[in-house]
């Protein structure tokens, strides 16, 4: 007596799809372990990563002029009792 299991084509396609995703996941995990999860080749030597203190600071300088003729050129603004004195402002990032 012959015994075989008949599988529906939709079920077979689903099994193949799940198996292919499992294989892709395993390949990804193995490559992640081999390449240190950062895309770097472990057989090569890389320079050490630079720290944040070694980066040069960026200085932003904003200059405001207090000419009355250019008031309407700047656009609408909110007027308060004591407007802040205009001048040179700088921010170090």
UniProtKB/Swiss-Prot annotation:
GO terms for cellular component: membrane. Its main location: membrane. Residues 70-93 are annotated as: Disordered. Coiled coil: none annotated. The chain crosses the membrane at residues 14-34. It is a single-pass membrane protein. It is found in: Membrane. Keywords: Membrane, Transmembrane, Transmembrane helix. The keyword Membrane applies. The keyword Transmembrane helix applies. It comes from the Eukaryota. This is Small integral membrane protein 36. It comes from Mus musculus (Mouse). The gene is Smim36.
């Amino acid at each position: 007596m012959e015994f075989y299991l008949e599988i529906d084509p939709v079920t077979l396609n689903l099994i193949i799809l799940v198996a292919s995703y499992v294989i892709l996941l395993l390949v990804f995990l193995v490559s992640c372990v081999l390449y240190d999860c950062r895309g770097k080749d472990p057989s090569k030597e890389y320079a050490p990563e630079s720290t944040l203190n070694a980066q040069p600071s960026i200085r932003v300088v904003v200059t405001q002029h207090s000419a009355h003729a250019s008031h309407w050129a700047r656009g609408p603004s909110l007027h308060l009792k004591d407007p802040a004195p205009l001048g040179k402002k700088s921010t170090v990032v």
